Swiss-Prot record:
Annotated GO CC locations: cytoplasm
Keyword Magnesium carried by entry: yes
Pathway: Metabolic intermediate biosynthesis; chorismate biosynthesis; chorismate from D-erythrose 4-phosphate and phosphoenolpyruvate: step 2/7; Metabolic intermediate biosynthesis; chorismate biosynthesis; chorismate from D-erythrose 4-phosphate and phosphoenolpyruvate: step 5/7
Keywords: Amino-acid biosynthesis, Aromatic amino acid biosynthesis, ATP-binding, Cytoplasm, Kinase, Lyase, Magnesium, Metal-binding, Multifunctional enzyme, NAD, Nucleotide-binding, Transferase
Protein name: Bifunctional shikimate kinase/3-dehydroquinate synthase
UniProt organism field: Thermotoga maritima (strain ATCC 43589 / DSM 3109 / JCM 10099 / NBRC 100826 / MSB8)
Cofactor: Mg(2+); NAD(+); a divalent metal cation
Name of the encoding gene: aroKB
Molecular function GO labels: 3-dehydroquinate synthase activity; ATP binding; magnesium ion binding; shikimate kinase activity
Residue span of region Shikimate kinase: 1-161
Cofactor remark: Binds 1 Mg(2+) ion per subunit.
Amino acid sequence: MRIFLVGMMGSGKSTIGKRISEVLDLQFIDMDEEIERREGRSVRRIFEEDGEEYFRLKEKELLKELVERDNVVVATGGGVVVDPENRELLKKEKTLFLYAPPEVLMERVTTENRPLLSEGKERIREIWEKRKQFYAEFRRIDTSRLNEWETTALVVLEALDEKEISTIEKPHLVKIILGGFKRVRNEELVFTTERVEKIYGRYLPENRLLFPDGEEVKTLEHVSRAYYELIRMDFPRGKTIAGVGGGALTDFTGFVASTFKRGVGLSFYPTTLLAQVDASVGGKNAIDFAGVKNVVGTFRMPDYVIIDPTVTLSMDEGRFEEGVVEAFKMTILSGRGVELFDEPEKIEKRNLRVLSEMVKISVEEKARIVMEDPYDMGLRHALNLGHTLGHVYEMLEGVPHGIAVAWGIEKETMYLYRKGIVPKETMRWIVEKVKQIVPIPVPSVDVEKARNLILNDKKILKGSRVRLPYVKEIGKIEFLEVDPLELLEVVD
């Protein structure tokens, strides 16, 4: 694979190129820096000593070399597109134009080692006017409203050809496809969020409804609005609503689709890692009511789910780690892919090979569990690993769900080790990996408040016991009924 990035100075070619190299295991080459290395002097000195014409000659020679190389992502110089021969070479490659308006570029750039700006940043407008017709010959990505990870995700998605990773037929169809998100443009109606539209709007069909991000969408008010819109459209039972977003949005979409006209078609395109490895698979749909999370819901399997790990690249830090926690949970439940967590730097840099394998293992394990227990009566309780104490941390500390579950996994495992149930080696390995993913120390909590939360947990069985899932050995899940108040010994 070869990816070339073109654009004005300050458009982010080098920054985004470096991220892409880590995501796709490609070599990163900055053409200006490579010319400097070969010449043994800065671009500014080359301009001063030999002139711009000499520099452009060296630039053209280098470009001809690079289009013959494999597995590279290249940040071109801003003026490479002026030469028509260069443009013809670049048109034969996966070339993306990173756009930002001149006023944004002026905020981003410094004049250091930029000979064309020796007279000041205002020259950017003049340079843009001369070059914009050439940039327009390439696929454009507007970076002005996107952060670095959002831009990276969009460039990678544009550059990738479809590659199928896995197909799961039961309990419902799930396809894991790199580049598969682009199929969403063929959907009849999409429910999505403003953030998803901001990043991926170019792929969404015109027929779409926007809803809030996160748990805010899971209310009767938004359900009513969706019903009114569907009635206004005269939406028939034979058509499909596609939920495009995170877990809250897919929960909401599933609830609406399963109740409107007693059920219309339903598909998901999950855009967060947590939704890909958990919420979009298994047929649980719900909204919140009277302050209680997921208290009104349905069991309704989607007709199909398209999972593209590429779109998780755009996630905010923190939210991304929440998804990694869920994937870690599924990995230790299945016993597959534990070696992925021996590459923490690859996970941190969102390497797509590692992410794709994590998603594949997680979805396959979730599908296996749901097949055996579709209505959450037994084995599916294994998915509650870390959730008993995780619920306590989520409520008392106000942290995101994924972080709370990570702390819950750590503390519940330590409790079971102290009881002589989980072996020391297993406990140490799990705790080490959890701390690696979420390096935030587990806080002490008010024991009395924790006690009240535990006693009111919906997972409490008759006789005030809780069925606690645990990993005795990696890949071996077991259950133990315990007095939930005993768990308090590890939370203070």
